[in-house]
Amino acid sequence: MMELSTRTLGDWLEHWALTTPDKEYIVYSDRNLRFTWKQFNERVDHMAKGLLAIGVKRGTHVGIWAGNVPDWLTFLYACAKIGAVAVTVNTNYKQAELEYLCQNSDMHTLCIVNGDRGNDDYVNMVYAMLPELKTSQRGYLKSKRFPCMKNVIYIGPEKYRGMYNTAEILLLGCNIDDDELLEAKAKVNCHDTVNMQYTSGTTGFPKGVMLTHYNISNNGFLTGEHMKFTSDDKLCVCVPLFHCFGVVLATMNCLTHGCTQVMVERFDPLLVLASVHKERCTALYGVPTMFIAELNHPMFDMFDMSSLRTGIMAAVSYTHLRAHET
């Protein structure tokens, strides 16, 4: 029987930063944004210090409400390194669903972007949920309805009243010395909760599922082993990171095998095809509707997909007939 790893997510990240520092880890092909393992690990450490500076610590719940933006993974690993719990928030949530999750999870810090349904959509929903935020000093939020909530972070350069932005979190991290970060890292155990994912709530209220470093890293590792992943692979990830498909089967697979994670911020069949073509991806994840959209795209024949050797098609079965037709 294969022995399971007891490394934490932070251990894995630092392992590859030491052994393959100059190899590309995170790539956004359309933005030409690229992080090597060393560069990404350093950014995560800076962000972890910033979170410590605003009171995030071991056991603190930090929500991430965003599409697949570049710093989504930064915040995930920053939480992991200091023992905090990343709470993944569905990007399709409406006001009531967001409020339920924030209350139920005892959320301390919420990281957001503008949103996908109009300018400042998420920002306005957060202000509606936390009316005290606009008049609060950053880091000192006192909400009657959400007593655990102390911080809101805007992922990006824009500034909103009562919220930190990414640059300010990184700047605050400069006040935390290396020893304090090392002390926080040393307390993290592989059996600590690192991620809380909420169920769909089909037959009742969604329930927060508490997942450990040991749980999700080994899940991703074994998935990759079945797919014969190595550090030479490049996985194109166009599925949402808030879902287990993105944050576990994709991200943890890449993390535990040292391979490159080619990110697509929001699903677009043309962008997926272009990313696979440009980066010579060897694996692609998606659901049947995504694969059908890619295969039926009028520009499909313009792209070279020959580098692909494996992938995962999830959700529902893709009939042999349809596969044969394409």
Q: Model-found features: residue ranges?
A:
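AMP-dependent adenylate-forming
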Residues: 12-36, 156-160
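Conserved AMP-binding/adenylation subdomain of ANL enzymes
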Residues: 217-234, 242-283, 293, 297-298
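Conserved pre-ATP/AMP-binding loop-to-beta segment of ANL
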Residues: 21-24, 145-149, 153-160, 164-198, ...
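Conserved AMP-binding A3 loop
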Residues: 34-38, 185-187, 191-218
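Conserved small/polar residues in nucleotide/adenosyl-binding loops
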Residues: 199, 319-326
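Adenylate-forming
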Residues: 112-134, 239, 265-270, 281-322
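Structural core segment of the AMP-binding/adenylate-forming
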Residues: 54, 82-171
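Conserved AMP-binding/adenylate-forming core of the ANL superfamily
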Residues: 25-77, 94-99, 103, 165-174, ...
